[in-house]
């Protein structure tokens, strides 16, 4: 099972990725984790990436693809792998295709943006313990106060509506076009392609966690 998981920030990808990885006994591959591991290990790509990051630059897609190919040779990838947060752009998706990285499914968890803003904007956190509440779905017993200590709850900057809207706009501009990219590839696949076009699947990310998981497993057959 080799798949790419797509979905806007706040769509619940992280939760569902855990269930998918457990069911199919595959690792979740994140480019951030790969970069940190490669830099720590001092690999060829890690050294190159560190130079760029130390200078405040963005690591090139070529280096990321090199890291991906190295990572996929590890024994834990023998049954497959799940990409979460990569590719983010069409050039990255094209680079993966050109490099011959095989993918069986592209799975999109679809949640309306208004629902994501409601989900994330309502979060409140107790900083000392990490306890999380939601003003609508999981409110504290006393408004604005932690149930255990009575301390004031905060709204993280990442959860403020303005920040959430900006992140959703970036997703809409950069990552949502991947849906069309993969759909078109599947429809126009040709013999010259190094790898077979992945099947595109879309599930609704609204509803209970269990229902969403059931829908996902029904699509991944």
Swiss-Prot record:
Entry-linked SUPFAM superfamilies: P-loop containing nucleoside triphosphate hydrolases
- One GO molecular function term? ATP binding
Reactions accelerated catalytically: AMP + ATP = 2 ADP
Q: What class of enzyme is it?
A: transferase
Positions of ATP binding: 10-15, 123, 132-133, 207
- Spans annotated as LID: 122-159
Q: What is its main location?
A: cytoplasm
The listed locations are: Cytoplasm
The domain comment in this protein's record states: Consists of three domains, a large central CORE domain and two small peripheral domains, NMPbind and LID, which undergo movements during catalysis. The LID domain closes over the site of phosphoryl transfer upon ATP binding. Assembling and dissambling the active center during each catalytic cycle provides an effective means to prevent ATP hydrolysis.
Reported function: Catalyzes the reversible transfer of the terminal phosphate group between ATP and AMP. Plays an important role in cellular energy homeostasis and in adenine nucleotide metabolism.
Similarity comment: family membership: Belongs to the adenylate kinase family.
Q: How does it assemble?
A: Monomer.
Q: What is this protein called?
A: Adenylate kinase
Q: Which organism is it from?
A: Polynucleobacter asymbioticus (strain DSM 18221 / CIP 109841 / QLW-P1DMWA-1)
Q: Which gene encodes it?
A: adk
């Amino acid at each position: 099972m080799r798949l790419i998981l797509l979905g806007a920030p706040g769509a619940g990808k992280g939760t569902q990725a855990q269930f998918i990885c457990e069911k199919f006994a595959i690792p979740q591959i994140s480019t951030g984790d790969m970069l940190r591991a490669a830099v720590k290990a001092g690999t060829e790509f890690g050294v190159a990436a560190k130079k760029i990051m130390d200078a405040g630059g963005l690591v090139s897609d070529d280096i990321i693809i090199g890291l991906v190919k190295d990572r996929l040779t590890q024994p834990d990838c023998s049954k497959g792998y799940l990409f979460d947060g990569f590719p983010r752009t069409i050039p990255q998706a094209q680079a993966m295709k050109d490099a011959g990285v095989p993918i069986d499914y592209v799975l999109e968890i679809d949640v309306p943006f208004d629902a994501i803003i409601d989900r994330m904007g309502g979060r409140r956190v107790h900083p000392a313990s990490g306890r999380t509440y939601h003003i609508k779905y999981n409110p504290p017993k006393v408004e604005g106060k932690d149930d255990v200590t009575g301390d004031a709850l905060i709204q993280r900057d990442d959860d403020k509506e303005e920040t959430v809207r900006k992140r959703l706009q970036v997703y809409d501009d950069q990552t949502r076009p991947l849906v069309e990219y993969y759909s078109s590839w599947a429809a126009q696949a040709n013999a010259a392609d190094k790898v077979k076009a992945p099947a595109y699947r879309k599930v609704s990310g609204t509803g209970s966690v269990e229902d969403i998981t059931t829908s996902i497993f029904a699509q991944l057959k």
